């Protein structure tokens, strides 16, 4: 399977991009992790609404980056630029660059479909397809041309194990995913994402609709997943950001107000507005 999917993940290297003039907001200690995403001077508008302003942000491989900030600050808009889902909004326009492994994802030669193979997404509300658990997991691999049932069976088991839900569901694979609890549905959605072997997983408030026990399970899963994947998570939950993330970016009014190691953001922020937000003075 890995070889088959890898063949679908080859991106043209026919042109390079000059990044020498850019400036990034980056934590002081990168812990030797490589930059996988580099956002450079990004602005975004919904019609006349200037939703993101001069965003400069480096995301590091195999780390969990939390995106925090009050409602309407641009958090969800930002992560939807990372896989270009934001382009589904007709009035949207952008300026600046987002480099994914040194390639500008806004370049017309860059494949949007390829990007979404490399960068999976888990949404706020669990959104399984109205199909069996098995068909949910195999949906992506089948689109990529995998038809062999033995291979598909292996993908299902591997993905559900990766989402820490195989033991719960291994005898129910042909049950409709809608019959599961909210927490189980969300982990099936994570497994569906893992089935296409992404490098990055975007999570937009992945536990906000879940009960505390399901939330804890998803948080534990996210911590395990960073061994193989880069995780970028939007959350309103300050305690969650502090518990699970390595880096935290605080967005405010469309800007990155502060970006640093999570421990520093929550113990000794550099910016007064960051301190006010995480201490609950506004938000």
From Swiss-Prot:
Main location: membrane
Annotated compartments: Cell membrane
Membrane-related topology note: Peripheral membrane protein
Biased composition (Polar residues): 1-20
This protein's UniProt keywords: ATP-binding, Cell membrane, Membrane, Nucleotide-binding, Phosphate transport, Translocase, Transport
GO terms for MF: ATP binding; ATP hydrolysis activity; ATPase-coupled phosphate ion transmembrane transporter activity
EC number from the UniProt entry: 7.3.2.1
Protein name in UniProt: Phosphate import ATP-binding protein PstB
The keyword Cytoplasm is annotated on this UniProt entry: no
Name of the gene encoding the protein in the UniProt record: pstB
Domain ABC transporter: 37-278
SUPFAM superfamilies with a match to the protein in the record: P-loop containing nucleoside triphosphate hydrolases
Enzyme class: translocase
Entry similarity comment: Belongs to the ABC transporter superfamily. Phosphate importer (TC 3.A.1.7) family.
């Amino acid at each position: 399977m890995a070889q088959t999917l890898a063949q679908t993940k080859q991106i043209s290297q026919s042109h390079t991009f000059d990044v020498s003039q850019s400036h990034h907001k980056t934590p002081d200690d990168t812990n030797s992790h490589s930059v996988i995403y580099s956002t450079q001077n990004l602005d975004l508008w919904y019609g006349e609404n200037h939703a993101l302003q001069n965003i400069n942000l480096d995301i590091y491989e195999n780390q969990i980056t939390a995106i925090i900030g009050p409602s309407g600050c641009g958090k969800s808009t930002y992560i939807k630029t990372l896989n270009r889902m934001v382009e589904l909004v007709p009035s949207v326009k952008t300026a600046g660059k987002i480099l994914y492994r040194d390639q500008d994802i806004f370049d017309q030669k860059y494949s949007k479909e390829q990007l979404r193979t490399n960068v999976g997404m888990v949404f706020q509300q669990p959104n399984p397809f109205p199909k069996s658990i098995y068909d949910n997991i195999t949906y992506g691999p089948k689109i990529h041309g995998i038809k062999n049932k033995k291979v598909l069976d292996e993908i299902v088991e591997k993905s559900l194990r990766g989402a820490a839900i195989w033991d719960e569901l291994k005898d129910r694979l042909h049950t409709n995913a809608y019959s599961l609890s909210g927490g189980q549905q969300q982990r099936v959605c994570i497994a569906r994402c893992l089935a296409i072997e992404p490098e990055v997983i975007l999570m937009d408030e992945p536990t906000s609709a879940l009960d505390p026990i399901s939330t804890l399970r998803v948080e534990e899963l996210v911590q395990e997943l960073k061994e193989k994947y880069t995780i970028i998570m939007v959350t309103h939950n300050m305690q969650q950001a502090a518990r699970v993330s390595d880096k935290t970016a605080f967005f405010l009014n469309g800007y990155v107000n502060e970006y640093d190691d999570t421990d520093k953001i929550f113990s000794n922020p550099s910016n007064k507005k960051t301190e006010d937000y995480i201490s609950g003075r506004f938000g």
